[in-house]
């Protein structure tokens, strides 16, 4: 994004403070454009005026260019399942944040029998993992043409498309690619891949069907040349594949090419290579060894490039030892460091508690909250859980930083009216907040019990300490 201050954006806006965008002032709207929560197209008066006045239209186009991300954003698929890739602004997450999580696509191929194809598609579509308040899912399918038969490939693509997930069409033969596009072009699949040998045919297909296309070349000069050619021909949605090699010097070379592409695009301001990057961890299946070894290296490759600039990936393995670590890593890398993951503060009733059941307190840091809530629920423990607003910080950090205090605990007790729900005045605090025991007792008038350091030990702790002895 070329603009750095809200005032620069403000000068392009109507400056009427009409509020149609949902913000009180145009300056506030300008600030939210900078943090990417809205776009200039959300300014309705500006868009309406641009349709009538060529000068305003030019002004809007200039603003869109100025506020465009450093790396082009490409959309794969349509509707609510569409996957956005690219759109990044910085080389390092701590400089701002990373915006669009890496797209995870899993391969199927057109020589699979129908039953195996359906089973594999069902596994991908049904995968769901609950993690700190979010359900993590897989993004789509990469349909590989291994038969060389355009008719068969089209049939399989149609069947896979019926699952409603975004598609990557993996075929080097232009006839097979054309057959698939005739079937699913309206679903905006990503073409994979235009190479030195087929780029002319793929360029025609990208223009004809108006779908995004991947350019593949190990030589970065060639890759850039292809990108320039496609851009000048009118193709806007481009993905770059610098070729993923799975081991040793090959993997080192892949890493260096990816770093060079992204640094050139952002630090070097070279728009000719400022596109999302494709990584293919599936390349690990080309190495020698058993399936466990191959899938292990697939997870290793994916992990490297989730951290370093991989915007979209193609996988083979859908085993838990590959999916769980990579999808969890993706979530954590693409969590906004400016805003800790947190839950709403307040009172939670766990396992239908009664007036004589214990009252616990924890912070609203999502990882802490869901760990405690899960341990209480799975342990069959009936209790009341107070969730304190610590601005998304964990127990030890918030105690040290002043977000977890006796006065805030008192306010929470009063706001939730927990005193009306229980017959006792005992509060169980986390072991890491033990230093606050006396202060909370003085502030609230409640008797404070110091619980275990680990919420997984609450059940055993209660057996010894609840009900409390007077």
Swiss-Prot record:
Q: This protein's superkingdom?
A: Archaea
The answer to whether keyword Iron-sulfur applies is yes
Q: What are the entry keywords?
A: 4Fe-4S, Cobalt, Iron, Iron-sulfur, Metal-binding, Methyltransferase, Transferase
Provide the cofactor note recorded for this chain's UniProt entry: Binds 1 [4Fe-4S] cluster.
Return the protein name.
Acetyl-CoA decarbonylase/synthase complex subunit gamma
Identify one Pfam family in the record: FeS
Recorded GO molecular functions are: 4 iron, 4 sulfur cluster binding; iron ion binding; methyltransferase activity
Occurrences of domain 4Fe-4S (ranges): 1-62
Per the UniProt entry, the signal peptide is: none
Complex formation: Heterodimer of delta and gamma chains. The ACDS complex is made up of alpha, epsilon, beta, gamma and delta chains with a probable stoichiometry of (alpha(2)epsilon(2))(4)-beta(8)-(gamma(1)delta(1))(8).
InterPro entries found in the cross-reference section: 4Fe-4S_dom, Ac-CoA_synth_d_su_TIM-brl, ACDS_complex_subunit, AcylCoA_decarb/synth_gsu, AcylCoA_decarb/synth_gsu_arc, Dihydropteroate_synth-like_sf
Q: Which residues are noted in the entry as [4Fe-4S] cluster-binding? A: 18, 21, 26, 43
From the UniProt record, list the reaction(s) this protein catalyses.
5,6,7,8-tetrahydrosarcinapterin + methyl-Co(III)-[corrinoid Fe-S protein] = 5-methyltetrahydrosarcinapterin + Co(I)-[corrinoid Fe-S protein] + H(+)
In the UniProt record, the gene name given for this protein reads cdhE
What EC numbers are recorded for this enzyme?
2.1.1.245
Q: What does this protein do?
A: Part of a complex that catalyzes the reversible cleavage of acetyl-CoA, allowing autotrophic growth from CO(2).
Methyltransferase is among the record's keywords: yes
Q: Gene3D superfamilies, from UniProt?
A: 3.40.50.11600, Dihydropteroate synthase-like, Electron transport complex subunit B, putative Fe-S cluster
User: Which cofactors must be present for this protein to function?
Assistant: corrinoid; [4Fe-4S] cluster
Q: Which organism is it from?
A: Archaeoglobus fulgidus (strain ATCC 49558 / DSM 4304 / JCM 9628 / NBRC 100126 / VC-16)
Give GO terms for biological process: acetyl-CoA catabolic process; methylation
